[in-house]
């Protein structure tokens, strides 16, 4: 039995979890900063860092209390050390280093994107390797071939804006509240996704990259020409814009799956909480014999520490250890 306590502070959630054997979350505590950043319409890095300083130890204490496991029952401390906001990452890294030293436990640094890729192993039915992983968040839109824990190959990524960024910036153009992706998803449920024709957010050619800047620009031109609508017309606009983003994600993911002969697709990252993306990916998988799609519960799509504990557990089992010189790497590539 391997029990790992993990800390996640890469952006605006302060999170801590205790996970057993990389499969069972004994606790999973998340302190969100949505209310703090809402007035600014997005995450303010300095405010995020300051709030992490205040919240990190109370969140750790709560995670330990909920798990029923004390420091003596832990095998290691894992922490997100990149990528992310450097100030936010530093808070988590310093806390994890202090705890590992105080408790005499091994320390493991974890890539935040790997955490998303393995979050599905906390679900009731986990995927098997190999699988195609689509990580979609506010800062990342990437396709990975996952051949085993710690064994990933980047297949494609966004050339400009991430899908989550396209949602958030689109919502800001429409005067919707933060977080924008959630607001668009909610309104889109009442709208017609075919009401407005947006350009395909797909890079032409055989590669597996994405591009969302043109779609965002198309929304800007639409708003400049027609203004921001209200009522049903706003719902139609949200549904159409969302559909263009979702269509690009699903088409590229399944193109990669067919070309590279993957039978399993894992959706991960905050945008994987989008209801239309979840439905579209599930429906597309049903069209292909032998194709399965794995989507973690919504709470495991958004930033959390349980997924970091999963990745940290397997890094520990591979013999990986971080020393006292572990530092934040805001641009760490997986």
UniProtKB/Swiss-Prot annotation:
- The record lists substrate as bound by 135-139, 168, 181, 185, 274
Q: Which SUPFAM superfamilies match?
A: Actin-like ATPase domain (SSF53067)
An example GO BP is: tRNA threonylcarbamoyladenosine modification
What Gene3D superfamilies does the record tag this protein with?
Answer: 3.30.420.40
What top-level branch of life does the organism fall under? Bacteria
Listed under GO cellular component are: cytoplasm
Q: Which reaction does it catalyse?
A: L-threonylcarbamoyladenylate + adenosine(37) in tRNA = N(6)-L-threonylcarbamoyladenosine(37) in tRNA + AMP + H(+)
Q: Which terms does the record give in the GO molecular function aspect?
A: iron ion binding; N(6)-L-threonylcarbamoyladenine synthase activity
Q: Kindly list the positions annotated as binding Fe cation.
A: 112, 116, 303
Cofactor(s) listed: Fe(2+)
Enzyme Commission designation: 2.3.1.234
State if Flavoprotein is listed as a keyword: no
UniProt similarity note = Belongs to the KAE1 / TsaD family.
Q: What does it do?
A: Required for the formation of a threonylcarbamoyl group on adenosine at position 37 (t(6)A37) in tRNAs that read codons beginning with adenine. Is involved in the transfer of the threonylcarbamoyl moiety of threonylcarbamoyl-AMP (TC-AMP) to the N6 group of A37, together with TsaE and TsaB. TsaD likely plays a direct catalytic role in this reaction.
HAMAP family registered for this protein in UniProt: TsaD
Name the chain's protein.
Answer: tRNA N6-adenosine threonylcarbamoyltransferase
Q: Which organism is it from?
A: Anaeromyxobacter dehalogenans (strain 2CP-1 / ATCC BAA-258)
What is this protein's gene name? tsaD
């Amino acid at each position: 039995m391997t029990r790992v306590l993990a800390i996640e502070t890469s952006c605006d959630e302060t999170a801590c979890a205790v996970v057993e054997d990389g499969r069972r979350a004994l606790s999973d505590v998340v302190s969100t900063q949505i209310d703090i950043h809402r007035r600014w319409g997005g995450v303010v890095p300095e405010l995020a860092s300051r709030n992490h300083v205040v919240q990190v130890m109370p969140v750790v204490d709560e995670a330990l209390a909920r798990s029923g496991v004390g420091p003596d029952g832990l095998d290691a401390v894992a922490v997100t050390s990149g990528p992310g906001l450097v100030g936010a990452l530093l808070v988590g890294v310093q806390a994890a280093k202090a705890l590992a030293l105080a408790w005499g436990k091994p320390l493991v640094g974890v890539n935040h994107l790997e955490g998303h890729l393995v979050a599905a192993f906390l679900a009731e039915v986990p995927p098997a390797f190999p699988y195609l992983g689509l990580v979609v968040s506010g800062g990342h839109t990437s396709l990975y071939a996952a051949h085993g824990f710690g064994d990933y190959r980047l297949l494609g990524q966004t050339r400009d804006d991430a899908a989550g960024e396209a949602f958030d910036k689109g919502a800001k153009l429409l005067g919707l509240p933060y977080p924008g992706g959630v607001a668009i998803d909610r309104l889109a449920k009442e709208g017609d996704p075919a009401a407005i024709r947006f350009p395909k957010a797909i890079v032409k050619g055989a590669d597996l990259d994405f591009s969302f800047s043109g779609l965002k620009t198309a929304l800007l031109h639409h708003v400049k020409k027609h203004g921001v609508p209200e009522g049903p017309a706003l719902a139609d606009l949200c549904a159409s814009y969302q559909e263009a983003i979702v269509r690009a994600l699903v088409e590229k993911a399944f193109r990669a799956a067919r070309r590279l002969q993957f039978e399993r697709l894992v959706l991960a990252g905050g945008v994987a909480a989008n209801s239309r993306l979840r439905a579209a990916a599930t429906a597309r998988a049903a069209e292909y014999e032998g194709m399965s799609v794995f989507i973690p519960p919504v709470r495991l799509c958004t930033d959390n520490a349980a997924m970091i504990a999963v990745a940290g557990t397997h890094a520990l089992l591979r013999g990986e250890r971080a020393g006292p010189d572990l530092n934040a790497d805001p641009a760490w590539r997986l």
